[in-house]
Amino acid sequence: QQVAAGAVSFRKCTPCHNIGEGATNKVGPVLDGLEGRHSGSIPGFNYSEANKKSGLTWDKATFKSYIADPRAKIPGTKMVFAGIKNEKEQEDLWAFLTQYGPDGKKK
């Protein structure tokens, strides 16, 4: 249920992000293999210096604080999304995203 709800939430992300097998960078980077990945590390994506130098490694707590207010978490990020304030929606979205490994396949 949580993953299904997260899939619905991910629709807010699709104008800028892709995920899954064959995903490519768009306005934002591919989100495959997000858990444990360092911010600013997807090859071929033009990250802001702020993202590259943030030192963040994506885990649930980091993701939740970022997705609540991206520009507060990483001042200078290119991400213009206003954020998701609802904690349940943040959790659902994390559950959806983390089902995908670095190769875009579901774990």
Swiss-Prot record:
Q: Name the residues that span the membrane.
A: none
Location(s), subcellular: Periplasm
Q: Which InterPro entries match?
A: Cyt_c-like_dom (IPR009056), Cyt_c-like_dom_sf (IPR036909), Cyt_c_1A/1B (IPR002327)
Q: Which UniProt keywords apply?
A: Electron transport, Heme, Iron, Metal-binding, Periplasm, Photosynthesis, Pyrrolidone carboxylic acid, Transport
Query: Which parts of the sequence bind heme c?
Result: 13, 16-17, 79
Q: Which domain of life is it from?
A: Bacteria
Q: Which GO terms describe its cellular component?
A: periplasmic space
Which residues are reported to carry the modification Pyrrolidone carboxylic acid? 1
Q: Which family does it belong to?
A: Belongs to the cytochrome c family.
Outline what the protein does: Cytochrome c2 is found mainly in purple, non-sulfur, photosynthetic bacteria where it functions as the electron donor to the oxidized bacteriochlorophyll in the photophosphorylation pathway. However, it may also have a role in the respiratory chain and is found in some non-photosynthetic bacteria.
Protein's name in the database: Cytochrome c2
This protein's species is Rhodoplanes tepidamans
